[in-house]
Each structure stands twice: as C-alpha cells, then as structure tokens.
Amino acid sequence: MSPDIQSNNRISIQVSLSGYSFKVLAPDGAVVSASASWLGPGTVFTTPELQRRYVGAEIALMTPKFALVPSAFLLPGEEREALADVCDLAPGDEVRVCDVPQFGARLVYSLSVGETLSKVIAQSLSAAEVLPEIWYLLRALADVPEYNRIVASHADGRLYLAIAQGKTLLLANSYPAPDFTTAEYYLFLAVKRLQINPEASAVWFRTPLGPAEERSLYR
C-alpha cells in the first residue's frame, strides 16, 4: 500500500461552481499531494485521490451567503432573518448555522448556490460534511504565526477574506472579484482601512495560485 492510501491521511477539498481543488495531508499536516490548479467537474470520477479512503475529509463550498453573528445576539429561530439582512436568499434556500467558538460567534450560512458537485464529492467520501469556505478561513487564522493574520481564497469571480490581529477578528467578508487583480485591490483596500502594516503581515491563500499571481501578491 502506498503512503498516500494509508487510512491516517486526510483530504481537504474546495468546491466552487466551476470545479474543485484538493490537498491530501499527512497526520503531521504535511502535504502528501495536491492539485496544481483548479480542476473541472468532469474529473471527479477519474482523479485518483478522490477514489481513496481517508481518516478524515473536509469539504469547503465557495458560498457568499454567510453572516458571522456574535453568539449572544443570535436567538433561536432568527437565523434566516440574520442571513437575509446581508445577502439575497431565495425562498427555497436552506439556512444552516454552526459555531465559531474561537471568536465567540455563530456562522449562519446557506449552501444553496446552484451546484451539486459538493454533494457528489461528499457522498464519495463517506458523506463528509460540507461547510462554507469562510468557516475554514476563520479556522486557518490560528495557523498563521504572525500577529497580523490574513487568509483568503479566490474562485469563480469572488474573493473570500478573513483578517485578524492576534486573537481579535477584524473582518470576515467576501467581495466580487472577476480577476486576481480585483481580488488584490479588495485585499489591500481592507488592509489599508483596518490600518494594518502590510509589511508586517502574512497573507495565506487557500486556493491554488499560479506563478504570476504569487509574484503579483508578494511584489
């Protein structure tokens, strides 16, 4: 049995309307294998990494339908109203909620974005739970060693962004960004408005970046 088939590995998958990306992780967090770029939906049944079994699977869906609310302010039964205040909801959109204890908040969200790929992948991975990408961005902030922490993703013309200083969350939002240049604009605009020193900050992207995008980001 090869190392990347062992049951103690985990897989992390990001899904959008246009496709998906993945990383296979060893128990120590080291990347065993990963997609070099965004993959089309038609490759789901032929990608070897998606045909294997893992000790754990994480599936993140790119959905702009979310609201982060302080736990004390979100009363039972008010989840849909809280989400409708910040995004457009169709009558049939399912609204869910999960805890974000590290920031004393609850994340209200909807996975109803007109795709079925996340469900197909989840079923192939023993019904793994699908959570919004912003939930994983918020969790990833703790992995950034610098005091100024910035974690982002860019897919399907949208930037997802979370920023914190130490243990204090400053921003969790998404922005329309049809290209990476626009994504950078919103990223650096947020940094400027929050009065964060970009030279003393770390920017982590969860979505794959091409060489040109990496050069542009860190120039």
Residue ranges and their predicted role:
Residues 28, 65, 167, 209-211:
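Residues that cap or initiate secondary-structure elements
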Residues 1-31, 141-169:
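Gly/Thr-rich phosphate-binding beta-strand-loop-beta motif of the actin/hexokinase/Hsp70
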Residues 10, 105-106, 149, 201-203:
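Short active-site oxyanion
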Residues 77-84, 169-177:
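Glycine-rich phosphate-binding loop of actin/hexokinase-like ATP-binding domains
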Residues 12-14, 53-67, 198-209:
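Short glycine-rich phosphate-binding loop at a beta-alpha junction
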Residues 97, 109, 170, 174-219:
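Accessory, usually C-terminal, subdomains that scaffold auxiliary metal cofactors
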Residues 123-127, 164-167, 190-193:
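Short hydrophobic alpha-helical module
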Residues 20-142:
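Active-site neighborhood for divalent-cation/phosphate handling
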